[in-house]
């Protein structure tokens, strides 16, 4: 996670703005903890002691809450669909470097979910597979555009 140099508090604004505009996406709570949560997920996955139904995914889910503030977690598929809504909302910052970081942020979450032992066997459906493919295509496109924009500066 540190390779991507993610500064998580920078991502608070687009989520909050989208939520306040009434967009049907999740609000990210405790986002300052998200990079620690993702790092811990990766560490736990690498130790191979956690399955997808256990702590690794739960830690990601805890960072995201549906509009209902009393909900404590969401399912893996709901997390992926929420990310899909997020990338289709006007969430990108004007700054090219910031855009690249935001795309890497989305990619980091998808990577973390997919690398979790047991994810594919227990949770993958044709719809979810299409959603993940769409997210990966969006990330590829977004990073390509930011790379081109950097070259024009």
Please give the residue ranges for each predicted region.
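Short, highly charged C-terminal tails/helix-capping segments
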Residues: 126-134
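Short, glycine/acidic-rich hinge or "gate" loops at secondary-structure transitions
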Residues: 120-126
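Charge-rich, intrinsically disordered N-terminal extensions
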Residues: 1-92, 99-119, 135-153
């Amino acid at each position: 996670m540190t390779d991507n140099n993610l500064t998580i508090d920078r991502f608070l604004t687009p989520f909050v703005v989208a939520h306040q505009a009434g967009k049907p996406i999740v609000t990210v709570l405790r986002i300052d903890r998200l990079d620690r949560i993702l790092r811990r997920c990766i560490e736990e996955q690498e130790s191979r002691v956690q399955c997808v139904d256990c702590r690794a995914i739960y830690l990601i889910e805890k960072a995201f809450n549906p509009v209902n503030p009393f909900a404590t977690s969401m399912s893996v598929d709901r997390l992926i669909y929420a990310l899909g809504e997020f990338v289709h909302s006007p969430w990108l910052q004007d700054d090219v470097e910031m855009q690249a970081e935001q795309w890497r942020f989305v990619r980091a979450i998808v990577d973390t979910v997919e690398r979790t032992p047991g994810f594919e066997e227990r949770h993958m459906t044709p719809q979810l597979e299409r959603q993940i493919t769409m997210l990966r295509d969006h990330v590829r496109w977004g990073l390509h555009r930011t790379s081109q924009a950097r070259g024009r500066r």
